[in-house]
């Protein structure tokens, strides 16, 4: 299992950053997600499911994303999701925004990637944390850059 937790400070309003996680905006911060459509939206968000399609090169994967946690207040925004990728990995990620000042937001991206069968466990050992760290850093930097574009 690989775990991560990355924190950065974004010089933008919390609402500006949070909008990047809307269904209509998600491709700005997740460019490999080519489709994200609601399947079952629950009141209060938790338990809602979405069909998401990810494409990198010629490889295309479609999977169901479930909202596990959700909070949306003036000072804190939080969403935790889970999905099974390629029948080999159970991935949980959480996105937390904390309002530091009017135009200063702390962004915490954390999660875990667990191999759920022999193939998944083997691939995680081969890929290691170095590749995962690059993916995490790239994502956090993309959120930062897109938030900066939106706030200017």
Question: PLM ranges: what are they?
Answer:
Residues 80-134:
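Beta-strand/loop substructures that line and gate deep hydrophobic ligand-binding cavities in soluble
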Residues 38-86, 138-152:
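Glycine-rich portal/gate segments that line the openings of hydrophobic small-molecule binding cavities
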Residues 1-45:
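Hydrophobic ligand-binding cavity/cleft-lining segments
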